[in-house]
A protein has these predicted regions:
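Sensor-1/coupling segment of RecA-like P-loop NTPase cores
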Residues: 167-168, 172-194
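Intrinsically disordered, low-complexity basic tails and flexible linkers associated
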Residues: 1-114, 119, 178, 184, ...
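Conserved AAA+ ATPase "SRH/arginine-finger" region at the nucleotide-binding site
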Residues: 189-191, 204-216
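Short regulatory helix/loop adjacent to the ATP-binding pocket of P-loop NTPases
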Residues: 126-130, 187-203
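Short conserved motifs of the RecA-like P-loop NTPase core
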Residues: 231-243
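Loop/turn-to-beta-strand initiation segments
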Residues: 111-112, 143-146, 175-181, 205
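Conserved ATPase-coupling elements of RecA-like P-loop NTPase cores
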Residues: 153-166, 190-193
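Short glycine-rich substrate-engagement loop in P-loop NTPases that contacts/grips substrate
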Residues: 105, 109-146, 159
Length: 295
């Protein structure tokens, strides 16, 4: 998603600097200035598909799912702030963190919730520096009620961006506003990050989303079928769940491919068809289906 802070904030809200003190001009507290953004309409950048209702729960993600729901039910509590979710690609991190945002908006539509990736944040910051709009950039983010950031590992090695996010993080946390973060590894394994920022990542709740277990793999495949209004034979569900083991996205992709083959070629849904689809979708090794994590 792209989000142009300067364009999306009316000119009347732009914070200007007064070069010299004057008896006729009262200086404003910068932490009060950010409240002027609260009247600006904000697109939360949340994907409406990523809800709690569409999220498949199992033992492998139960802790993260339970905490995510608790944040929405009891936003006044700061026990899990920030919530830091980590895990490999394709295990449902983006879905879960956006579900928190959607749940919060459903409970309080006026809440200023924003989802974005760390890479988008870094790009916006670079643009703000180039255009001499860093104050506007910081004040905008300090006006957010819940900040949801994906892939914070993208901050690695970007010291200036980290320092800016550090100050935004401190302000939001001090104001008891929630921060939801995702990463591909735990804070202890993050390289190229400022120690003071890393320490703040662990202030609240750090929880892992591991590779999906068998129950979750079956549930994901069945939910895709239910959403499509298709009845899938149990032996096909079992075959896919047994052979696509590490990545929820791959399971969803297999379902789409299976339905495309069945529809386009007018073929019945069988294990043989599923085997053929998997052989073209994932790597075959020693007569067993395996695959790597796709980005």
């Amino acid at each position: 998603y792209s989000y142009d802070i300067v364009k999306d904030v009316p000119e009347s809200h732009v914070i200007t600097q007064v070069p010299h003190k004057s008896p006729a001009v009262q200086e404003m507290n910068p932490f009060v200035q950010q409240d002027r953004f609260s009247s600006v309409a904000l697109d939360s950048q949340l994907n409406p598909i990523y809800t709690f209702e569409n999220y498949c729960e199992s033992k492998s993600n139960k802790l993260a799912f339970t905490i995510a729901n608790a944040i929405v039910r009891h936003p006044e509590k700061q026990t899990f702030n920030p919530m830091f979710i980590f895990g490999p690609t394709g295990v449902g991190k983006t879905h879960l963190i956006q579900a928190i945002g959607i749940g919060m908006k459903e409970e309080n539509p006026d809440l200023r919730v924003l989802y974005l990736s760390a890479r988008t944040f870094e790009s916006q910051y670079t643009t703000a520096v180039r255009n001499n709009k860093v104050n506007d950039f910081i004040n905008f983010y300090q006006s957010i009620d819940m900040l949801i950031m994906d892939d914070v590992q993208e901050f690695a090695g970007k010291t200036a961006t980290q320092n800016t996010f550090f100050h935004i993080f401190n302000h939001l946390h001090n104001k008891q506003r929630h921060l939801i973060l995702s990463c591909d590894c735990p804070p202890s394994e993050l390289d190229g990050m400022e120690p003071r920022l890393l320490s703040r990542f662990t202030w609240g709740m750090t929880v892992e989303l591991s590779s999906p277990d068998y129950e979750l793999r079956r549930n994901v495949f069945l939910k895709k079928a239910l959403q499509a209004g298709v009845e899938i034979p149990e032996d096909i569900v079992d075959y896919v769940a047994e052979n696509v083991k590490d990545n929820v996205r791959e399971i969803e992709g297999v379902f789409v491919s299976l339905m495309a083959h069945s529809t386009a070629l007018n073929l019945p849904l069988t294990v043989d068809l599923a085997r053929n689809v998997l052989s073209n979708s994932v790597k075959m090794s020693r007569c067993q289906v395996t695959f790597g994590v796709f980005v």
